[in-house]
Amino acid sequence: MAKEIIFSDEARNKLYEGVKKLNDAVKVTMGPRGRNVLIQKSFGAPSITKDGVSVAKEVELKDSLENMGASLVREVASKTADQAGDGTTTATVLAHAIFKEGLRNITAGANPIEVKRGMDKACEAIVAELKKLSREVKDKKEIAQVATISANSDEKIGNLIADAMEKVGKDGVITVEEAKSINDELNVVEGMQFDRGYLSPYFITNAEKMTVELSSPYILLFDKKITNLKDLLPVLEQIQKTGKPLLIIAEDIEGEALATLVVNKLRGVLNISAVKAPGFGDRRKAMLEDIAILTGGEVISEELGRTLESATIQDLGQASSVIIDKDNTTIVNGAGEKANIDARVNQIKAQIAETTSDYDREKLQERLAKLSGGVAVIKVGAATETEMKEKKDRVDDALSATKAAVEEGIVIGGGAALIKAKAKIKLDLQGDEAIGAAIVERALRAPLRQIAENAGFDAGVVVNSVENAKDENTGFDAAKGEYVNMLESGIIDPVKVERVALLNAVSVASMLLTTEATISEIKEDKPTMPDMSGMGGMGGMGGMM
């Protein structure tokens, strides 16, 4: 297929048109008075969203060059969402403002490479200043404030997330699911839960709830299949003498071994239950080791020279209780030593920092949560499916923003932190580098300007008032239309969100500004079918018979 090559200002202007169209669609969602965007779906009902990245992902432009520009900024929104969980609209608005201002200067003759260098230096200085302006999240109230702002000023969602974080801790896992009713709920699972249920319903102790409930059980951990009960007999005899229940966690328990355990359970010889070990392969071994550390036991592993026959009661873990249903096993208050659990937690945190795979990171974080806190499930309820999706998006955003705030701290919100950081930096740059730095500094007004515009206020007046305010915590509350102390009013943003949004915006804008040529496919119009209306139908061919 033939390709079209376009150079210099013409190429950059085309790319800018695409960026502008994407920005125009995304920017309307910004701030407490931002509007919704209605998105047509290829099937089913249209979706309504106020989530910047959801809007950006749907933008596909007809012109291939414009679409290239839009797709680069769309990538910025997605990357910002992946890294910080929020700030996608801020990143898009900043990228557009930097590109627009930079394009004007480069068209006027500035050197793109020097301009880029100045932009990078300004970005670095502002990020450093943002970190200085930040402070730690102090209490549950501030967590609720961050979540409320990110959830489009929905206090109920903010409080729900604050409750969840208080219960499972900052390392705990908080998941968001759709509720069966119209009400929002918070369910917290204390202790370690993994997704394996009982191997036989005959183990059930609570027929009403269809669960196995073991009080102060011993826990045997084995990393292979158990097919022969003979290997288990020595440890079973020791358990029987104590009169305590036993939970067996192994790769699998099959045939004769499982049947004999069930018979012993039904006859009342042993209060016993068995489940499969969670995970697969190396992850299964790691999770068994986690359970061993949590319960103060040891994994009986043939790789370490241990056989099931050699297991003693000292190798078994303990917990205050274990609850098993058909899908999940929950171990509450494992008897492991705190020092060993802390060491394991730190080891998993180090692995999270080193891994480059998103999937591995997610699985490691799940393991970390199960060891350190617990799991909270926020169930989001709504009257219609469309509202449910929109609300779930907001809860996901708020949850990510809250985690970012706990991780790196908070700054004043509403776009004011970027303006305050700009006022504090002093750069000694010359020529086109100074122009590059000035481009970034001017663009930092764009988020506040957009928030004010969406709320129906004069953006120039608002930006000027915030820039000239004597108190560095003063910003603009767009919901009320007042200048307030942002910290006292609870209008706060995670510094990570601001930092990541700025870094990604500068990165993509500088790439676009240093583009000198574009290569795109020439779309060829497919020939239309010839008009056959004049042939008079098949009847006119009768003479050929």
Swiss-Prot record:
Reaction catalysed by this chain?
ATP + H2O + a folded polypeptide = ADP + phosphate + an unfolded polypeptide
Q: What does this protein do?
A: Together with its co-chaperonin GroES, plays an essential role in assisting protein folding. The GroEL-GroES system forms a nano-cage that allows encapsulation of the non-native substrate proteins and provides a physical environment optimized to promote and accelerate protein folding.
In this chain, ATP is annotated as bound at 29-32, 50, 86-90, 414, 477-479, 493
- Molecular function GO terms recorded: ATP binding; ATP-dependent protein folding chaperone; isomerase activity; unfolded protein binding
Enzymatic class: isomerase
Quote the Pfam families the UniProt record gives: Cpn60_TCP1
| PANTHER family recorded | 60 KDA HEAT SHOCK PROTEIN, MITOCHONDRIAL
Q: Quaternary structure per UniProt?
A: Forms a cylinder of 14 subunits composed of two heptameric rings stacked back-to-back. Interacts with the co-chaperonin GroES.
CDD domains assigned to the protein according to its UniProt record, in alphabetical order: GroEL
Q: What is its EC number?
A: 5.6.1.7
InterPro entries according to UniProt: Chaperonin_Cpn60_CS, Cpn60/GroEL, Cpn60/GroEL/TCP-1, GroEL-like_apical_dom_sf, GROEL-like_equatorial_sf, TCP-1-like_intermed_sf
Q: Which domain of life is it from?
A: Bacteria
This protein's GO cellular component annotations are: cytoplasm
Q: Which family does it belong to?
A: Belongs to the chaperonin (HSP60) family.
Q: Where does it localize?
A: Cytoplasm
Residue ranges annotated as coiled coil are: none
State the name under which the record lists this protein.
Chaperonin GroEL
